Each structure stands twice: as C-alpha cells, then as structure tokens.
Swiss-Prot record:
One of its GO terms (biological process) is response to hydroperoxide. This is UPF0246 protein BDI_1226. Pfam families: H2O2_YaaD (PF03883). NCBIfam families: PRK02101.2-5 (NF002547). Coiled coil: none annotated. HAMAP family: UPF0246. InterPro entries: YaaA (IPR005583). GO terms for cellular component: cytosol. Belongs to the UPF0246 family.
C-alpha cells in the first residue's frame, strides 16, 4: 500500500532529527530547471503569481536565488516539509526502520520536484501548480508534470500490492493523468468528517491532521492490509461503514 500526500507550503532547510542517508529525487533535473527559471521573477511578481505577502515573497525570492548554491545543503523531504500534515506525521521519534518503511510506502506530490520519496533530498521552495513558466511551454505546472510523473506513480504502486492510499488533497490530481491511475491501481480515499449542525462536514484543518495521523499510524504499525486501516482512531475519529461507499472511506468525529 502506497500513501500519497500533498506537499506543505511551509518548509525548513534544517532539522535536528537524525534520518537515514538521503536519496536523489527522480526528477532532480526538472526541479533544477524550474528553480532556475523561477530566479528570473522579481519579488513583486512572485507575490502575484504565488499569492504571497511581500514578506513571504521576499523569502521565496531568496530561496530560489540560493537553490543552486552548493553551500546550502538539502534535507530529506519528510523533514523539510513542516505543515500540519507533516507535524502530525511527527517523524521526530521515527526509528531508522520507520524512515525506511516510509521510503517504500509514502510519496509526496511537489510542484517543483514532482513525485517525491520521503528521503529524497530537497531544498526549500514555494510553488503552486497553476503557475506558468514561459520557458517550460504554454501550460502551467499541472501540464508540465502530468505526463512526466503519472507512470512513475503507477510503477511505484505496482511495486507493492497495487493499492494507493490517497491522502492528498483534490488539487493534486490534475498533475497526473488521474483517469489512467484509476484504471491501473486500486485507490482508497479516506475522508475525515465532523458531525456539525446536524450533518457531516469536512473541516480542512482537522482533515489535514487526520491525514498526517493516519500516515503515522500506517508507518508505525507496518500496516499492509488496507482493512486494518479501518481500526484507525484519533481524537474521536473512527471508521463509519454506514457512511462509506466502495473505496471512499469515511472517518467521523461525533
């Protein structure tokens, strides 16, 4: 079973957490090219295309200017991302075996690096899939990655039991030939809902927390049977058979 996760917007370039030796991203050449073209954008343009405050745009500008600097060391992706999902994966207590298990059973979808493994070494960046870089063609980053990474994802899922645990947000799907992925492997998509105002609602922050916690649960317990995921509970969230349909599994907090 392979976990698919969205990247985080917040990142760091340093960590005190000890992890196994990093690996080279499989689309490193593409990432280098993207980052090189991003250096041409001034701060105000980065603010516009990435929808950033002036302060964050300035930070983004510095990061792209430093992207190819040899004195700026990359960091394993699972440590570099610091958003809500990754805080809840909480790799600070991972053993070497946990990291290695995650390397085989987890993938992140990056607008700059493409499909990433947890130990792939990356540098901080900021990217949105709707960004257009003229030198890379007429389309945006969705178009850039769609054909490049689809077969890589399918191959990675088929290396195991042909089951993809889709814990990514909907907005990453257009970066793949998603219909082809659906035809090629089984996709299980958990949904995390809260009972509010007489109905089940998705609250984004809680959904992100649960995605991270479920990923951690799978890694720490070495889960390979998807049925075992139905035993996942966290902060009152639990699997609801009556609300689930097919491979769309609902976990409800009542």
């Amino acid at each position: 079973m392979l976990i698919l996760l969205s990247p985080a917007k917040t990142m760091t370039g340093t960590s005190k957490i000890k992890a196994p030796q990093g690996t080279t991203p499989r689309f490193q050449q593409e990432a280098n090219e993207i980052a090189l073209h991003m250096t041409q954008f001034p701060i105000d343009e980065l603010s516009r295309i990435l929808k950033l405050s002036p302060k964050l745009a300035a930070e983004c500008y510095r990061r792209y200017q430093d992207f190819h600097a040899e004195d700026k060391q990359p960091l394993q992706a699972i440590l570099a991302y610091t958003g809500v999902v990754f805080k809840n994966i909480s790799p600070k207590d991972f053993t070497e075996e946990d990291f290695l298990f995650s390397q085989e059973h987890m993938r992140f979808v990056s607008g700059c690096y493409g499909l990433l493994r947890p130990l792939d070494l990356i540098k901080p960046y900021r990217m949105e899939f709707d960004v257009k870089i003229p030198e890379l063609g007429d389309g945006n980053m969705y178009a850039f990655w769609k054909d490049r990474q689809t077969n890589t994802l399918i191959h990675d899922v088929r290396q195991g039991d042909r089951i993809l645990l889709n814990l990514a947000s909907l907005d990453i799907q257009p970066s793949f030939q998603w219909k082809e992925v659906e035809r090629s492997v089984r996709i299980i998509t958990p949904e995390f809902k809260i009972w509010k105002n007489g109905k089940a609602e998705t609250i984004v922050i809680y959904a992100k927390m649960c995605r991270g916690q479920m990923s951690r649960y799978l890694i720490k317990n070495r889960i390979s049977d998807p049925e075992a995921l139905k035993a996942f509970t966290w902060e009152g969230f639990s699997y609801k058979e009556s609300m689930s349909e097919g491979d769309n599994w609902v976990f409800l907090q009542e």
